[in-house]
Each structure stands twice: as C-alpha cells, then as structure tokens.
C-alpha cells in the first residue's frame, strides 16, 4: 500500500491529523484535501518540511515556512538536523514568526544536538513536540521518550505537556 492510500485510509478512519511533505506532488495533496473535505474536516493536516542535512540560515527557514504556508494545511511543521546548539535557536525562532502570521507551527530539530528544541518548542508556543513511547522506537534521531519528556517538564516545573 502506498503512502497516498495510507493517508487516505487514515482520513477515512478518522485520524486526528495526517502529515504530508511539502514536496509532494500537487495533485496528491489535492486528493488528500478532497478526502478530508469528504469526511467533513474531521482530520486536520500538517504540511511538513524536513532537512536531514542541517539547519539553513534564518531567511531560508522563513522562506521554507512561507512556502509550506502557501500549500495550506492546519499546521506547518519545519524540522532540521542540528549540528550545533545555535541551530536550535534558529528553528525555534520560527515559532514567533509563525504566530505573527497567524499560523500554527511545529518547529524542532533532529539529532543529538536537537534534543533541547524538542523540549523547548511547546514551551515557546509550538503546537506540540514528538516523543517515542519507549527507547528503541524513535522515529527520528534525538527523539526523547515520553517518560523522559514528562520528567524534564516536571523538573522544569512546567507540568506535563
């Protein structure tokens, strides 16, 4: 079964969200949106952009966000690979940028250096972060477990997210 069919099935079954990469062919995005409309918008959709090689400069990140926003979706997701701690600051800087444009965003970094962005993103106004259920089931490098995230938020005194 191809990803298009899996996304359509997710919509039919009432998934809360589906995630589609910004580089997906327009006609496939159109098919997915039609499926969402057919099911009365029960499912919301995320337009995502992943950069596995690194984190571009601020201006390039903002252009990427704007391009994803033009595609549509309920949430824009920008994920890059952090090679240095400063990369986290650039990606997290998209959160106020998105807020100023009236858009919901998920902005975080992958990799060992990106772990802090996964914790900080929701605290700074991102829609959410991602965590694995247990060690060894991570969907991206640097992803913490749900238990680790809960412990960090408890230690920070922010409560569970």
Task: List PLM regions with ranges.
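Short, small-residue-biased leader/transition segments that mark boundaries at the very start
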Residues: 1-3
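Active-site loop-to-helix "anion-binding N-cap" substructures in soluble metabolic enzymes
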Residues: 8-12
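Short, well-ordered alpha-helix to beta-strand connector turns
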Residues: 14-15, 73
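Catalytic alpha/beta core domains of metabolic enzymes, predominantly
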Residues: 22-161
